[in-house]
Amino acid sequence: MSNGIVIIGSGFAARQLVKNIRKQDASIPLTLIAADSMDEYNKPDLSHVISQGQRADDLTRQTAGEFAEQFNLRLFPHTWVTDIDAEAHVVKSQNNQWQYDKLVLATGASAFVPPVPGRELMLTLNSQQEYRACETQLRDARRVLIVGGGLIGSELAMDFCRAGKMVTLIDNAASILASLMPPEVSSRLQHRLTEMGVHLLLKSQLQGLEKTNSGILATLDRQRSIEVDTVIAATGLRPETALARRAGLTINRGVCVDSYLQTSNADIYALGDCAEINGQVLPFLQPIQLSAMVLAKNLLGNNTPLKLPAMLVKIKTPELPLHLAGETQRQDLRWQINTERQGMVARGVDDADQLRAFVVSEDRMKEAFGLLKTLSM
């Protein structure tokens, strides 16, 4: 490979790929291009920065320069890729262009902001860069509205509450974590958040935001309103697909790839939050780690299909942490819930009494690995 591998992106997926490639080949040319600083940080830490009093710069684990030196890379930080010429094997920015033999899209996903009047007043916490832009506002805010009661929204609600702030969480659904599990399973965490002082506005809709002299007025349905100091959107992520679309690649929710992480173009691959693997978007650390291991082999000519095992998803709510696995969102499962003082084990079984999903909490999380072994895939 004379031009080597070009990777667009510098997040967790890109870094895992670099590490796996370098384990097998120390000299193949590797070029990374990204719009951010390319400094390394642990993205899940963003769910806990407020209660731990961390500044954005405190999150940095390794600078871009250290990363480049350690893994023999060419890095182009603060660089927006504008176009991909798939036929000519060229990646373009406004002032530069790069030839590639193989190209990897690791462009991640962006936070979805609900399209309501005043949406520009909402903050998002999807990167170190975003946190840096609003950390003073978040630290100084006394009244916080979190829009979205999913995984990130629930984590943030607990964190802001632990930091002593007045927290309101709003969601259209009738329970928190509604896209991940049924209400009878999430109710333990929901009750804990309420006990801590989080004001839950479920089955409720944000209709607009307006700046006032003393904060932000949030207008809700049913002629309700509340005033807060800051509003955070935690309503999910959208895979970044614009570049792939311009390159003529097949797009659905994400950039469509097969079991080899290959897109509809033989020399372009996708990895991480931007990728849709055989119809599934999997924005969690473990599938990204496993995908990076497989893709490194494929880029170096050792074709290997990705085979994902049953995997744990961790909800980092320290006052009541949860692990879950399997098809927890399936509507046809019967849930067998065992609740004790030290935690909960909820088993989701199908009509044949096969274990298809489970959720464990607190001290009973240690039972997760045993349950994983009996999970039917």
UniProtKB/Swiss-Prot annotation:
Top enzyme class: oxidoreductase
Reaction catalysis annotation: 2 reduced [nitric oxide reductase rubredoxin domain] + NAD(+) + H(+) = 2 oxidized [nitric oxide reductase rubredoxin domain] + NADH
SUPFAM superfamilies in UniProt: FAD/NAD(P)-binding domain (SSF51905)
Compartment(s) of residence: Cytoplasm
GO cellular component: cytoplasm
Pfam families assigned: Pyr_redox_2 (PF07992), Rbx_binding (PF18113)
Annotated Gene3D superfamilies: 3.30.390.120, FAD/NAD(P)-binding domain
Main location: cytoplasm
Example of a GO MF term: oxidoreductase activity, acting on iron-sulfur proteins as donors, NAD or NADP as acceptor
InterPro entries: FAD-bd_OxRdtase, FAD/NAD-bd_sf, FAD/NAD-binding_dom, NO_rdtase_NorW, Rbx-bd
Pathway the protein acts in: Nitrogen metabolism; nitric oxide reduction
Enzyme Commission designation: 1.18.1.-
Keywords: Cytoplasm, FAD, Flavoprotein, NAD, Oxidoreductase
Function text: One of at least two accessory proteins for anaerobic nitric oxide (NO) reductase. Reduces the rubredoxin moiety of NO reductase.
Family named by the database record: Belongs to the FAD-dependent oxidoreductase family.
Record-given protein name: Nitric oxide reductase FlRd-NAD(+) reductase
Native organism: Escherichia coli O127:H6 (strain E2348/69 / EPEC)
Lineage: Bacteria, Pseudomonadati, Pseudomonadota, Gammaproteobacteria, Enterobacterales
